[in-house]
């Protein structure tokens, strides 16, 4: 939107040409979404408090969480608005990859919105039935996966990139649809499961978005992708704008979500951000790297799966409570310390993921 305007104004003043550079636009998009989040934050918090849109606490959860019952939720709407506005302002809207991500981001945001809304109306922690949530997530993930496969099949956009191996890049064929589906849905639900402590989910999301921004920039640059022996994907460079918009909005949200949180993102935020990370990794062909960089999310998800399976088999629990961050809480680890430790782990995993681009 603003990029298009600047391109028109360059004939009047050559200085507007600076907005044609991806690096400049990525920095501006980060700042735009950051300051929008800071601007909306206090206003959204007051609005949510006024209409009693507050967090519903699980009665079987840690007792230390009971004080959070009056904390406003659905703050993810603030994140979505900031990200979408920044992306529409500073990206080339003719780039189809931008719209693929916005489709998933918005679609999963709507699912999360209705999930949060139902929790608030029913005044319990049970929102949409798991079956219906999964069905709608699947519809969005399958539809975008099929569309991308039909449009880009047998190109670099449908190859499987394996870290550490520069010569092994098989064409996935129809397996592309299945892999993309699991990555998008899995990433969305993994972030959702992790979002149980103040700032626990948003900071790893920011770190991973930074990692994906570097990956998108390299993948969309024919010289760097050739140097690093990764597939060149023509349109992926513009995804940097989405990544930096998520970074800015996430940091702005963290301003109010850090311990003790004044607002929670709710499912409207966690489902949409997780879905966005998933589709970006699919479009840049770095699904395996997302698994590495998102190790905190993976750990949280595996802990839930193991807890459920082990309980059904033996009637006993592996952890005091799942996801695993609740286990450490119940063992006496203070929430702020636990959050920062997970942040540190996430940061290290993102650095590890980025380093694999060179180690091939």
Swiss-Prot record:
Function: Catalyzes the initial step of the lipid cycle reactions in the biosynthesis of the cell wall peptidoglycan: transfers peptidoglycan precursor phospho-MurNAc-pentapeptide from UDP-MurNAc-pentapeptide onto the lipid carrier undecaprenyl phosphate, yielding undecaprenyl-pyrophosphoryl-MurNAc-pentapeptide, known as lipid I.
GO molecular function, one term: phospho-N-acetylmuramoyl-pentapeptide-transferase activity
Highest taxon listed in the record's lineage: Bacteria
Catalytic activity line of the entry: UDP-N-acetyl-alpha-D-muramoyl-L-alanyl-gamma-D-glutamyl-meso-2,6-diaminopimeloyl-D-alanyl-D-alanine + di-trans,octa-cis-undecaprenyl phosphate = di-trans,octa-cis-undecaprenyl diphospho-N-acetyl-alpha-D-muramoyl-L-alanyl-D-glutamyl-meso-2,6-diaminopimeloyl-D-alanyl-D-alanine + UMP
GO biological process: cell division; cell wall organization; peptidoglycan biosynthetic process; regulation of cell shape
Name this polypeptide is given: Phospho-N-acetylmuramoyl-pentapeptide-transferase
The protein's Enzyme Commission number: 2.7.8.13
Pathway connected to this protein: Cell wall biogenesis; peptidoglycan biosynthesis
Family designation: Belongs to the glycosyltransferase 4 family. MraY subfamily.
Enzyme type, top EC level: transferase
A cellular component term, taken from the record's GO annotations: plasma membrane
Primary location recorded for the protein, binned into one broad class: membrane
Ranges annotated as spanning the membrane: 27-47, 73-93, 94-114, 130-150, 168-188, 199-219, 235-255, 263-283, 291-311, 339-359
UniProtKB keywords: Cell cycle, Cell division, Cell membrane, Cell shape, Cell wall biogenesis/degradation, Magnesium, Membrane, Metal-binding, Peptidoglycan synthesis, Transferase, Transmembrane, Transmembrane helix
HAMAP family to which the protein is assigned, alphabetical: MraY
Co-factor(s): Mg(2+)
């Amino acid at each position: 939107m603003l990029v298009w305007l600047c391109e028109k104004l360059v004939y009047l003043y050559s200085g507007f040409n600076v907005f044609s550079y991806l690096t400049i636009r990525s920095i501006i998009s980060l700042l735009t979404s950051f300051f929008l989040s800071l601007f909306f934050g206090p206003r959204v918090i007051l609005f949510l408090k006024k209409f009693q849109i507050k967090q519903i606490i699980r009665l079987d959860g840690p007792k230390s969480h009971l004080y959070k019952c009056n904390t406003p939720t659905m703050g993810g709407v603030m994140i979505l608005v900031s990200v979408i506005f920044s992306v529409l302002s500073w990206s080339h809207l003719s780039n189809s990859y931008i719209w693929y991500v916005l489709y998933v981001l918005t679609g999963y945001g709507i699912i999360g919105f209705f999930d949060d809304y139902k929790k608030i109306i029913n005044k319990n922690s049970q929102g949409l039935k798991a079956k219906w949530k999964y069905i709608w997530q699947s519809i969005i993930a399958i539809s975008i996966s099929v569309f991308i496969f039909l449009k880009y099949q047998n190109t670099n956009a449908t190859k499987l990139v394996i870290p550490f191996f520069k010569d092994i890049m098989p064409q996935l064929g129809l397996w592309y649809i299945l892999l993309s589906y699991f990555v998008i849905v899995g990433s969305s639900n993994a972030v959702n499961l992790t979002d149980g402590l103040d700032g626990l989910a948003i900071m790893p999301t920011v770190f991973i978005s930074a990692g994906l921004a570097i990956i998108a920039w390299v993948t969309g640059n024919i010289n760097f992708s050739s140097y690093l022996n990764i597939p060149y994907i023509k349109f992926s460079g513009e995804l940097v704008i989405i990544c930096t918009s998520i970074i800015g909005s996430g940091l702005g949200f963290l301003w109010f979500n850090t311990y003790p949180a004044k607002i929670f993102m709710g499912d409207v935020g966690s489902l949409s951000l997780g879905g966005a990370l998933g589709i970006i990794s699919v479009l840049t062909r770095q699904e395996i790297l997302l698994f590495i960089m998102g190790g905190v999310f993976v750990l949280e998800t595996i802990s839930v799966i193991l807890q459920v399976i082990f309980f059904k088999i033996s009637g006993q629990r592996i952890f005091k409570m799942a996801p695993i961050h609740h286990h450490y809480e119940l063992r006496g680890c203070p929430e702020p310390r636990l959050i920062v430790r997970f942040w540190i782990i996430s940061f290290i995993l993102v650095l590890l993921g980025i380093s694999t681009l060179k180690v091939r």
